[in-house]
Amino acid sequence: MPAFSCAFPGCRRDLLVIVLVVFVGIGLPIEASAPAYQSHGTEGSHLTNITNTKKAFPVLAVNYEHVRKPFEIALWILLALLMKLGFHLIPRLSAVVPESCLLIVVGLLVGGLIKVIGEEPPVLDSQLFFLCLLPPIILDAGYFLPIRPFTENVGTILVFAVIGTLWNAFFMGGLLYALCQIESVGLSGVDLLACLLFGSIVSAVDPVAVLAVFEEIHINELVHILVFGESLLNDAVTVVLYNLFEEFSKVGTVTVLDVFLGVVCFFVVSLGGVLVGAIYGFLAAFTSRFTSHTRVIEPLFVFLYSYMAYLSSEMFHLSGIMALIACGVVMRPYVEANISHKSYTTIKYFLKMWSSVSETLIFIFLGVSTVAGPHAWNWTFVITTVILCLVSRVLGVIGLTFIINKFRIVKLTKKDQFIVAYGGLRGAIAFSLGYLLSNSHQMRNLFLTAIITVIFFTVFVQGMTIRPLVELLAVKKKKESKPSINEEIHTEFLDHLLTGVEGVCGHYGHYHWKEKLNRFNKTYVKRWLIAGENFKEPELIAFYRKMELKQAIMMVESGQLPSVLPSTISMQNIQPRAIPRVSKKREEEIRRILRANLQNNKQKMRSRSYSRHTLFDADEEDNVSEVRLRKTKMEMERRVSVMERRMSHYLTVPANRESPRPGVRRVRFESDNQVFSADSFPTVHFEQPSPPSTPDAVSLEEEEEEVPKRPSLKADIEGPRGNASDNHQGELDYQRLARCLSDPGPNKDKEDDDPFMSC
């Protein structure tokens, strides 16, 4: 032990020296020369020196090239998230400047910094944009697309998306071609097809820019779905026009057959994309039917099938955006019925996170690509392009709305038209399409410069001023509160009611076709795509059950669920009673009777269309009157049973019947005080309730269904007795006691020290 303690300081110094030597020699090669071995031979002897060189084991090494790409991607994402976080931490800034504007400014600063240090700034590559950054944004928009507003306004959306985009493309292309023919502009070499190609690139409204701005101003649902739906559905028109004019530019000549094939190509691209997306959506729904034992992989099927739908559409040169929208819309109701609540939460937040990161990166790369260049500036061409974008948008919206309002029930007001026209923002899709132009195109750099200028003008000027304009014009905002169960149930009820009205009138509108589609979906589609679907439950009851469960889950998650359980004493007084069930045979017989009585009237009403020259027969009028009388009688019986139940709830009986009754009982009302003597106090007789009847006791021979009455305690009050002179006073006493027994009891808001009756 002493020897060890003496030697310990020396060991510590040696260990320190070893550590210093290792850190000094990190990554440095250390050469060691081995001793020379000499070999002597009798014949041809020679001397050979063998020098062995070896490296020390590197404790710490740096190899940046090995992780360069993923490391830089992670740094870009981290930068985007930090900018997004800092933006929302400054409320004054976020209230004035849209998030997209700030991100573009950050991209400009980062691109300038990269260029200052002598590096080449990265450019938003079209393949990276279309295959990696755009799909999450479109999938998020399509999966959570509000179906009801979209379907109710799909006609208006298609008019703006198809006809409006065609108008913008040809209007801008034609006027720009006329501008280029002026010699002072210096662009006389630009032909018509090149101008039309540029017009098709700039004419489309960008969904990324629209989402970034309209989500912050909280505009009303109608205007939002019109602008956003147009930005989603105009992709097919943009793709067809871009490919068409690019191909015509290479060929040089255009025939009538080429124009006809271009029109056919539009329908193939749009409808083909929808078909591909719907197929993958049904596959995702069918796959989710068998994931009850492996819940952890449920979200992956949603993401993978959606991305495969997009890639398959792009592979066949179809509209990938429409494929993603169709896939999300088709799969959502079936997938959410099969997956667990945790998987639904995972899908929701992952899509929101993924789309938010992609949107942030797109705007930052727009700023960086602007610095990277190259640019070709022409003041006349660029300024004219910006002005024509505004003019064509305003004229197109006003002209199309004038025609659309003739067919709409809810008209688009002047304020709505202004917001729709002012909200036509351009974004990264236009830049990526311009970047796809070949380097040999003589106008490529000028087109890119004009496109970037239009994007900056729409995002900065229109995006920053649209919120003050909405406040100034007092445009209706979106309702933030979610509809209650009562509102949604009545909305569903009104849909069925309007379907019946359309059937009676003989006019088959969208409510009729919606009912047909829902019936087909419930009868055939859900049977194969939803696991354990209860088809025997009525649709309205199933909808109410679903909404009630959804609201209960929301209340539990928010911590607003009140305590509704009864007390322990009340629970002890509840006696469990076996509820008899109706047999299948008897239930089918009841259904047959109800169907025979209700369906006949429905068939009679639908058998003929409305005509003011046609009168109903007398027997049909008698049948209608008989049905009304039956319904009135059933309603009266229901009200009587409700009154009996309320009386039985508030009628009290003395606990000890054998206790001597006092000589005088005092009954005090709020209006007056009256004292009853023992002789004048009326007698109350009580009858025991009869035992409850079972469903087997229901007679099926009657055509109408009797409302079952709840057994209650009945009280029979004898009238006052006395001579003729006291009849009036006795009747008053009798009425007061009857009021006492039939009154529902004291108000809960009254104080406890003021009882209703005291004995």
Curated annotation (Swiss-Prot):
Where, per the database record, does this protein carry Phosphoserine?
641, 648
Pfam families reported for this sequence: Na_H_Exchanger (PF00999), NEXCaM_BD (PF16644)
Regions that span the bilayer: 15-34, 76-95, 98-117, 123-142, 150-169, 196-214, 226-244, 262-282, 312-330, 353-372, 377-398, 447-467
- Classification via Gene3D superfamilies: 6.10.140.1330, 6.10.250.1040, 6.10.250.2020
Q: Which GO terms describe its biological process?
A: regulation of intracellular pH; sodium ion import across plasma membrane
Q: Which residues are glycosylated?
A: 49, 338
Q: How is it modified after translation?
A: Activated by cAMP, protein kinase A and protein kinase C.
Q: Which residues lie on this side of the membrane: Extracellular?
A: 35-75, 118-122, 170-195, 245-261, 331-352, 399-446
List keywords of the entry alphabetically: Antiport, Cell membrane, Glycoprotein, Ion transport, Membrane, Phosphoprotein, Sodium, Sodium transport, Transmembrane, Transmembrane helix, Transport
Predominant location: membrane
Region called Disordered, residue ranges: 681-759
List, alphabetically, the GO terms of the cellular component aspect. basolateral plasma membrane
* GO MF annotation list: potassium:proton antiporter activity; sodium:proton antiporter activity
Topology in the lipid bilayer: Multi-pass membrane protein
The record's section on InterPro entries has: Cation/H_exchanger_CPA1, Cation/H_exchanger_TM, NaH_exchanger, NHE-1-like, NHE_CaM-bd
Membrane topology (Cytoplasmic): 1-14, 96-97, 143-149, 215-225, 283-311, 373-376, 468-759
What's this protein's function? Involved in pH regulation to eliminate acids generated by active metabolism or to counter adverse environmental conditions. Major proton extruding system driven by the inward sodium ion chemical gradient.
For this protein, the record's PANTHER family field holds: SODIUM/HYDROGEN EXCHANGER (PTHR10110), SODIUM_HYDROGEN EXCHANGER (PTHR10110:SF192)
Q: Add the further remark from the entry.
A: Inhibited by amiloride and 5-amino-substituted derivatives and activated in a cooperative fashion by intracellular H(+).
| The protein's name in its UniProt record | Na(+)/H(+) exchanger beta
Source organism per UniProt: Oncorhynchus mykiss
